[in-house]
Every structure is written in structure tokens, then in C-alpha cells.
């Protein structure tokens, strides 16, 4: 929105030329989203407390979590508001990639909102019935997948980039839709599974978004994309503003979500943020790099799959509890230790993911 206003005022005020620079708008995006989150945080927390919208803790969960019962939840509303307002202010709204991410962010946010609402109002830890949750997640992902395929059919936008190989970029054809579906839905649920400890999900989300900001910038730059042997996608550069909005909003939320948490993001936040990260990965053609950079999310998801599979096939559990962060809690690790160590792992994995752009 601001970029359109700046274009009108440039002939009269040279200062507005600054808004042409992606780097300047990216900085403003971080600061705006951070500022909005910090401003909304205390107000939202107070409102949630007045409405008695508190976390419902499963009885079969770790005993240490019982003290979290009643902590305000649905704080993801603050994250989504900060991201959306920031994007509308600083992004180029004529860019279709921006709207694709916003569509998934708000669509999955709506699904998460209904899920959280059912939990806190009915005091039911199950929330939205699983089949309906997956139905709406699938519907949104497929609509976006078909739209993106129709827009970029048989171009670099539908190629698969394989890390560590310089020119291995097969054209996916209709398989692009299948891959897009699984990446968006899978990442959404993976972030949701990770969101079990104070600050555990939001910091890896911030780190992965920061990594994708770098990738989006390189992908949208004709010289760097050629140098790194990745597809040149001119629309991708505007995703830098989207990624930095996620970074800023995430850091602002972490201010209140750090241990001991004053508020939880709930499914409204985790499902939406995961869906947004998956969509960004698809748009910059780095789905496989997402697996590396989002390794913490992958690890959490695999621990659940292995736990359920092992119990059904052998009648035995591999971990004391899944997702795996609960396993370490039950081993005696204090919650802050689990959180910070997972953050460190995430930071290392993001750096490895970025290194794959050059190591080919």
C-alpha cells in the first residue's frame, strides 16, 4: 500500500524513493511487525484473561504442564494481525505471491481459530474434529496449489530444485499440485505438533522465515539466481517483506511467550504460521531445503509417526512420550533446557539449509 503512495509522491519528494528499495522495506517490515506485536501483546493478554480464554491441558500430558492450565491462549491472533497489517503496508500488493501467502495464512488461521474456540469454550482438548480440520486444510492447500500451477505452468515456477546438485531441476507438471499440497498441509501440522513448550515453535519459525528471506531475495535477483544456479523468479523478491514480517511478529510474540509463558499462540497461530512457511517454500522452489531448515519440525513429526507406528505394530513405545520434546522432559530435562537446545539445533539447520545454495 505504502509503495503505491510513494510512487505518486516521488516526483515531488525524493525521500519517497527509499521505498523502492527492497532492503529498506524489509527493515521497516521487521520493525513494524515487532512494534505491533509488542503493542498488542499486553492488551490481548488482558482481554483473554477477562474472557477466561485459557489453555486446556491434557490429563495424560507431563505433570509439569498442569501449572500451565488457564494460561491465556489464542495469542496467534496477535501474530496474524501484526503480519497481515505489515504486509498490507509495506509489500507490493500487485504481487500474486504475496496474496498466496496471505490466503494460506488467514485461511489456516481461521481453521485454527475455530479449533481453539471449541477447546476453550467447551473445555475440550480435542477441539475441532480431526477430519474437519484436515478437510479445510486440504481444501485451502489444493485451491492455492491449483491456482499457482495455473499461473506458473511449465515454467521455472513449477520446477523442483534438488539441493547439492547444480542443474537438477526437473519439471514437475501435475505433480507440482501434489507436492504443494503435502508441503503446505505437512508444514502446518508439523509446526502445530512442535508448539508444546514455551517458545519452542515460534523461534524455529522465526529462524526459518529469516532463512527464506535470504533465499527469496536471491531467487528474485537475476544475477544471484544465475550465480547460485537456482530458478530466477521475479515475483519471489517481494516475499522478503513477507518473511521479515513473520520474523518481526514472531519476535514480538516471543517477548510474551518465553518461559514462563504469559500467552500461548494456540492452533490459530501454529497452523497459520506452518502453512505460510510451506507456501513460501513452494513459491521459491525450495521445498527440500525446508526439510533441512525446518528439521526441528520434521523431527517432532517423525517422533509422533514412529511412536504411533511402533505401538500399533509391536505394542511398544519408542519414546517416553511424543512429540519428542515431551520425551526429554520426562527424562528430567528442565523445560528451558529443552527449548534452548531445540533453538540451537534449528539455528544450525537453517545455516546448513542456506549453505546448500552454494554447495552444489
Curated annotation (Swiss-Prot):
Species name: Vibrio vulnificus (strain CMCP6)
Family the entry assigns: Belongs to the glycosyltransferase 4 family. MraY subfamily.
Catalytic activity as recorded in UniProt: UDP-N-acetyl-alpha-D-muramoyl-L-alanyl-gamma-D-glutamyl-meso-2,6-diaminopimeloyl-D-alanyl-D-alanine + di-trans,octa-cis-undecaprenyl phosphate = di-trans,octa-cis-undecaprenyl diphospho-N-acetyl-alpha-D-muramoyl-L-alanyl-D-glutamyl-meso-2,6-diaminopimeloyl-D-alanyl-D-alanine + UMP
Keyword Metal-binding listed: yes
A GO term, aspect molecular function: UDP-N-acetylmuramoyl-L-alanyl-D-glutamyl-meso-2,6-diaminopimelyl-D-alanyl-D-alanine:undecaprenyl-phosphate transferase activity
Protein's name according to its UniProt entry: Phospho-N-acetylmuramoyl-pentapeptide-transferase
Pathway involvement of the protein, from the record: Cell wall biogenesis; peptidoglycan biosynthesis
GN (gene name): mraY
Enzyme Commission number(s): 2.7.8.13
